[in-house]
């Protein structure tokens, strides 16, 4: 076997030589080959490879998340469009077994010129499927397709100075290098009398291009086959429609990466051999070691190298999760600490933000908050002169003091600890809230950005604002869900109408406008830029409105409108913390339960069914009002997001998949219960076929329940409404406590 010779010539360790000799003598009964997916997992973490290899033994939170990720980014459509632009002769995606796919690839390779999708190659114990392979004589173009945006005028695959492969695309480029390594090896082994030249490309969404075709999303619809596998079904006239555009305006481009791939394979890129990247091995050494470990189903003998990325490990089970699967994350950490420590101590994992050096702490064997000193966290982002509340440095120490129960640390915060585990700066809030102008306006946006532009003139990953919700709070304390918008025509560009509707909602008075985080400010500034280059008759009026409620930079100078939106998230960071509910996280999905469980006033008020009647709603009828407060068996307020209508069957996702839709949150129900779910739901509305939508089981030919689109729109409206109502809950909590 060629691999054995390679191992002898290149591996320094005797153990590796014996391993490969052993692999030749004992072939496993059920053959398992080292694939692109396995290689990608090993790059992320070599110790994960064993867990990935044994899916029936180990819990994996990402096990079924490919569909959601690809749907959210438009990956399915990019792949199909790439095949059309490349003029693929034959697609081998339906040949599932190793031997059959390799056999058919070899048959097609006999042609002088051919373009193959999912071309299969095996070399020793390694196997790859190439997204698109073009053969012209003895010249082969190996094209990997990714739903990532790229600007070749600015972005670089590799630093010219250090030769380090850019971290943002490193996994992609290494993926292509691995494919080239296997394909070249397979070709040399099978066609020893021929000399093939393999050239590598990454085909990605081109940020320098604007679509010259409207409705690309209508050309590609997603269905699931009888085995549950997702597939793209193209419109009958897809080629005809695409041919209406000009080749120079194609929004996906094959960027050459052959030079950097050659350097990777030769072990000459700057990241190799240091900083624990690939176990400090060179590329070929690492690939062969990982291939052996994977195919022989054996672990690395060394203890895992821990880092801050371990905190987001998909092989970590949730506390209290009961099933028969093992916890790979725990197995790794138990090599370095005790089970008692993992159960009882507060990990540094929940410390987030700037000024932290978690990798350094971990390398020094400090995994828990009670092991940190003041020297470990740098002071950063100090308060502005005269500004009240916590800065981010102080907030970190507040969290540490509450998590660890350290009385000495708590001393500096004790005058603002209003109940066990709850910090509230009443005086700071009172000072801040005195500057607000009534009526108050709470707004929240839902947006999407995918690789293939929906509309003519758009760039890849350009933002589309498809929904907003608006609650109003009057000076007498009355509350109303005053307005909302959801794009009802997914074939029309919604951004400008979105701003028109928002303007109508907010121009009735001069009251303060609130957002949660910076997203709304960024989106409105993005739409202002889109308006600048548009032909809309009212564009000047709309831009002027946007400038009144946002801030933006121009030539390094920040300009803020007279009603520049107030960020409620920043107020939470400065004035409020509930350790039991938040644990270092500040998303509105974490803060809402923290506020509700901290307030007897809110518990009493919203345990009554007043929402929809006393508090008017755009979506809850007055004769069917609801109560937002429901207590669980532990007398704990359940998250109101869990009360939303069940639409998991509409999305076609599992409970575990729902958990993954929003990073750092754990909404585990079948509801549109976070921003990631809303984005996924809207993209499903755009991309999934009527047959796929119906296949979820939500509707039948004689069904009396709402259609898929109607049910999904209702869920989106309810979700966004709760986002702005959550902001109202936070305001009410603050208002009640400053009386």
Feature map (PLM): residue ranges:
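Cationic, low-complexity basic patches in intrinsically disordered or flexible, solvent-exposed regions
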Residues: 6
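DEDD superfamily 3′-5′ metal-dependent exonuclease/proofreading module
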Residues: 10, 15-739
